[in-house]
């Protein structure tokens, strides 16, 4: 079982510089005796079999640096800050059915729509805000990969990650029934076949924002995320770039070692209420038993959840609640409620990825966390309003900022 207190004690012992590491050894021995060994990262259950060479990394040999040293006079000019996603991108095939067939049965789809999913909408949302955006994950070779590459080209999203030439990118069948249920059947492909060196070629510069989504934490690519997080260190103030992590309620599939490394890196955490409760439970954070009623205690519950979980994480935290807005907490500070923007719920898929993408884009432009959250709230609301086939569509920058201005004007 993951023990957040042991993780923080281990980090404190390492920072103290105890050369004989007696404290570290004692803590680790205690942790091993009290709980089972952390689970290892297991390969993705993929039906795509590699038959050729391994993934070919993109030509970006320089590693991230936190030295802060001035560049030599002959060094090339630094590029603008950009959003870099370590998430996975695949294709969803959405099928509307009356009901799921029984085993061996048959069902006809009323409507079938292929759409790019995973971290794609977050990437698109960042790019539409005018921020340079890059994808560092793996893309394969085949019809699904070609669909993704075309979308990247069309929207000026740069792919800087490995290209796997012996396997196509995977896809998901998403069955939407008339009762509102969603059933997923996944075929994992190149996107899930990463390793510890997957993100070694990512070239980070001051001001960049690295986005990590939960879809890259639960298969073989998780080893690459872990390696990246470990080299990023545990002091966010020493990093010239920011890390934004968006977990989901599927945290039980993230192994203990990776979760500990993520917590110790102290990124900016952003999630909805369900994922926040799941994370708090996994970390052993205290949860106040505040009933959610129409009388207004929802706000109190969200504030308490954000405060308790943020205190446990010792890192910036955003908890989203759709049109109700978001609750933001900085380490050592009070919880701030950022108003949302009411909209009619016509979507079948979450607007959380749009929120995360715009949040990252605004952080890359130098906005504060609260300011970035306000803009992201507006973008998520508009994306629901613009939904196509139940899928939120990221809005353009001008429309988002206009909504933010109208919201600010209405408060005065």
Predicted regions and their residues:
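Glycine-rich phosphate/adenosyl-contacting loop at the front of the ribokinase-like
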Residues: 2-138, 143-150, 344-345
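Conserved post-catalytic alpha-helical subdomain immediately downstream of the catalytic base
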Residues: 4-7, 11-13, 68, 308, ...
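Conserved N-terminal subdomain of the carbohydrate kinase-like
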Residues: 80, 102-108, 128-212, 237-239, ...
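Structural motif
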Residues: 84-86, 186, 209-211, 244, ...
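Active-site metal-binding loops of divalent metal-dependent hydrolases
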Residues: 89, 215, 354
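Short glycine/proline- and charge-enriched loop/turn segments
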Residues: 99-108, 286-290, 336-339
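A short acidic, amphipathic alpha-helical/loop segment
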Residues: 220-228, 256-262, 371
């Amino acid at each position: 079982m993951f023990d957040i207190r042991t993780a923080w004690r281990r980090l404190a012992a390492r920072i103290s510089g105890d050369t004989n590491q007696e404290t570290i050894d004692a803590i680790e021995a205690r942790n091993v005796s009290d709980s089972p060994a952390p689970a290892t990262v297991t390969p993705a259950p993929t039906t795509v079999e590699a038959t050729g060479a391994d993934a070919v990394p993109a030509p970006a040999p320089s590693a991230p640096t936190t030295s802060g040293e001035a560049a030599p006079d002959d060094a090339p000019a630094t590029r603008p800050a950009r959003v870099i996603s370590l998430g996975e991108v695949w294709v969803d095939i959405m099928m509307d059915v009356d009901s799921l067939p029984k085993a061996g049965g048959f069902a006809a789809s009323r409507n079938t729509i292929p759409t790019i999913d995973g971290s794609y909408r977050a990437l698109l949302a960042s790019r539409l805000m005018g921020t340079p955006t890059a994808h560092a994950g793996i893309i394969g070779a085949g019809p699904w990969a070609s669909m993704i590459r075309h979308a990247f080209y069309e929207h000026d999203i740069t792919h800087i990650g490995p290209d796997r030439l012996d396997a196509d990118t995977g896809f998901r069948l998403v069955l939407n029934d008339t009762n509102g249920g969603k059933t997923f059947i996944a075929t994992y492909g190149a996107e899930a076949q990463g390793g510890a060196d997957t993100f070694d070629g990512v070239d980070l510069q001051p001001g960049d924002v690295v986005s990590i989504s939960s879809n890259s934490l639960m298969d073989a690519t998780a080893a690459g995320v872990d390696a990246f997080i470990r080299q990023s260190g545990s002091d966010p103030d020493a990093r010239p770039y920011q890390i934004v992590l968006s977990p989901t309620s599927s945290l039980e599939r993230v192994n203990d070692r990776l979760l500990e490394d993520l917590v110790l890196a102290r990124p900016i955490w952003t999630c909805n209420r369900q994922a926040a409760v799941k994370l708090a439970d996994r970390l052993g954070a205290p949860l106040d038993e505040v009933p959610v009623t129409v009388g207004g205690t929802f706000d109190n519950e969200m504030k308490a959840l954000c405060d308790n979980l943020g205190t446990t994480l010792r890192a910036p935290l955003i908890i989203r609640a759709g049109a109700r807005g978001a609750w933001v907490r900085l380490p050592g500070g009070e919880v701030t409620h950022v108003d949302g923007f009411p909209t009619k719920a016509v979507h079948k898929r979450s607007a959380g990825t749009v929120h995360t993408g715009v949040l990252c884009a605004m952080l890359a432009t130098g906005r504060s966390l609260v300011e970035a959250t306000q803009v992201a709230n507006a973008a998520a609301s508009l994306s629901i309003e613009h939904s196509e086939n139940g899928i939120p569509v990221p809005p353009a920058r001008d429309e988002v900022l206009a909504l933010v201005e109208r919201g600010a004007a209405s408060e005065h």
